[in-house]
Amino acid sequence: MASLPRRLLWSVSYIVRESFPIVSKRNCVSLLQGSWRKVLSVGVGTSLCAIPVGQRSEPTLSSESLIKRAASLVADSSSTFLSQTTYALVESLTEYTTAVYTLISLQQKYSSLLDKINSNEESAIWQVIIGARVQINQLKEQYMKYESSWQRAVSLSEMAAEAAYQSGADQASMTVRNHIQIVQTQVQGARDQAHMAEVQLAASQTEEIKRTITEDKGNPPSGGSPRNSLSEEEDIPEAYLRED
C-alpha cells in the first residue's frame, strides 16, 4: 500500500513526459512538489486568518473622571459666554462715551459761535445737538442691555468655577476665576470713562443754563429761541446746580 502513491506519481510523470517531451523527470517532480507547497501555504494562511485577534479596549473611565471632564467643559463654555458679553459691553460703553464727548464739543462750539450766527444757523446747530442727544439715549439703553447680559455671564461663570472646584477640576476653576477678575477690570475701566464723560456733560449743560438765565435777565426773551426752549427742558441734577 505504501508503494501505491509512488507508482501513481511515476505514472503521472510518464504521461507528462510523453505529452511534453521537453519536461524532464526532475522538472515534473519539482512542478508537482511546488504545487503542493503553494496549496500548503494557502491553507496555513487561511487558518491563521481565522484565528481571532484580541482588540485593545480603552480603559473604562470612572464616574468621578466623567464628572470632572464635564465640569471643565462647562467652565470653558461659561468663559466663552463671558468673553462675548464683555466685548459687547465694553464696545457699547466706548461708543456711548464717544457720543457724550461729541455732544460736549458741539455745545462748546455753539457757545463760542452764539454771537456770530443768525437765528436760522442757530436753529440748524440745535438740530444737530438734539440729534446727538437722541443718539446718546439710544446708546445708553444699548449698553444697559449688554450690562444685564454681562452680569448674568459673571454669575454663571462664578457657579461654573465653583462646580469645577467641587468636582476636582482645580485648574479649570482657577482659570475661570482669573478670567472673571480680568473682565471685571476691563468693564470697570470703561464705566469710569463713561462716568467722567457724563460729569463733564452735566457741567457743560449747567454752565449753558446759567449763561442763558443771565442773558434772559438782561434781554427778555422774544419767544421761539431754540436755546431757551431746550434749556428749560434740561434735567440737570441738583448737585451740579448747587453752589458751595
From Swiss-Prot:
One annotated GO biological process: neuron apoptotic process
SUPFAM superfamilies to which the protein is assigned, alphabetical: Smac/diablo (SSF46984)
Pfam families with a match to the protein in the record: Smac_DIABLO
Assigned keywords, A-Z: Apoptosis, Mitochondrion, Transit peptide
Ranges where the record places region Disordered: 208-244
Any single Gene Ontology cellular-component annotation: mitochondrion
Composition skew (Basic and acidic residues), residue ranges: 208-218
UniProt transit peptide range: 1-57
Motif (IAP-binding): 50-54
Subcellular location: Mitochondrion
Subunit structure: Homodimer.
Protein's job: Acts by opposing the inhibitory activity of inhibitor of apoptosis proteins (IAP). Promotes apoptosis.
Family, per entry: Belongs to the Smac/DIABLO protein family.
Protein name per Swiss-Prot or TrEMBL: Diablo homolog, mitochondrial
Higher taxonomy: Eukaryota, Metazoa, Chordata, Craniata, Vertebrata
